[in-house]
Amino acid sequence: MPPCSDDDVWAVTEFAEAELGDARRTQRLIALATVLAQRPGASLPEACGDDAMLKAAYRFFDNVALEPQDLLDSHIGATFPRLATVPLVLAVQDTTELDWTAHPATTGLGPLGHSAHRGLLVHTTLAFTPERVPLGILAQQVWARDPDDIGKRATRKQRPIAEKESQKWLTSVEAALAARRACPQTRFVSVGDREADVYDVLAVERPAGVDLLIRAAWDRCVTHAERYVWATVAAQPVEATATIQVPRRGAQPPRTAPLAVRWCPLTLCPPRHRKRERLRPVPLWAVHAREEAPPAGTDPIEWLLLTTCAVHTVAEALERLDWYACRWGVEVWHRILKSGCRIEARQLATAERLQRCVPLYSVIAWRIFYATMLSRAVPEAPCTVLLELEEWQALYCAIHRMPTPPPEPPSLRQAVHWIARLGGFLGRRGDGEPGATVLWKGFQQLTALTTMYCIMRPALPKRRKYG
């Protein structure tokens, strides 16, 4: 995004430590990140701007010496210092499908949920503060499903977890453990949806400072009189009422949902089909919340959460629900990746090239999301926490139609609202805070404005070129 600053360019911060076997490859990664972030929704030819950069981009994604994880490791390392500044991080993991069915010539893709569709699966762990600010990506797994695995559901109980897609949840928990080792003063909670309700995940060994929060999918056996999870929780009295904000979903508008809340400790029995392994029971806490009177035509919100975090008070129960509500942030990030960065429109001919492309655009999508949420969490902070000097100066001059910016930067909230205006945000009384869509459009406009600002003010430092 910063097109002309010599120092602290965001792409340098996130990718400078990438170990790609040759310093020139790292420089190329930084150059690509900078260029693609300026126009995240544009095609590669449009974003690159000239034949030399376009050819370099294609060569980069075609380089078999580069592993997708190599491209992400530097960003993960840059994320750790951000994690170390907060007491609690929610490591939210989720899977999405990237569908390239519209590009049938692409080789190496696998089947998706709809058997006729082809694409890649992406399982990502995003680090959030409880205030919903995404601090970075902790882990990402990208793969094409093997067509031979289709139809093996009947044998899933006979196969170890390492041979199933469920391993992705354990891999992401391991990423939270690694983050804890790097940031020993920060507490981590790994958050997963119903697909993460796997015994091996719930029973994983964890050090102090790393916990689990998983939405229940199965009515598992427990060591209590009611015998099963749901019956045990249903036997508890309603102890509190919670209110959560439900985001927009398709044609359904956002709404506020009141939930009846109950909780209790319980102990899960090991799976019966694994008796020979002599697995141990798993002590957990359950928090149940249900929307008793949803709007007509709307399914009620109902969560049964299993957690290793103790729940003794109303405040603790409500806190666990609030943590799980943070999971919707991953869905927002998925939308930015797909709609804002148009990752499914990338035409690179092979799945292997796409697997190198996804991590780069994932970090670009995170950057857009970070700007959106940071301005809501710390609105009065100076905008320099996000923007380079020339960016906020160009933004100010463009919005106010003035040739000279003030000596002091505006607040982060004010700057983000101005960027959103560039993307079509009207800022009317009932519009609320700008969202990711208008911001990614606004950032593209800001790039052009800043470039012109640097050209028209020759005294400013010139843009450093990478690669």
Regions found by a protein language model. Give the residues of each.
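Single, function-defining residue in the core of a domain
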Residues: 1-106, 114-121, 126-467
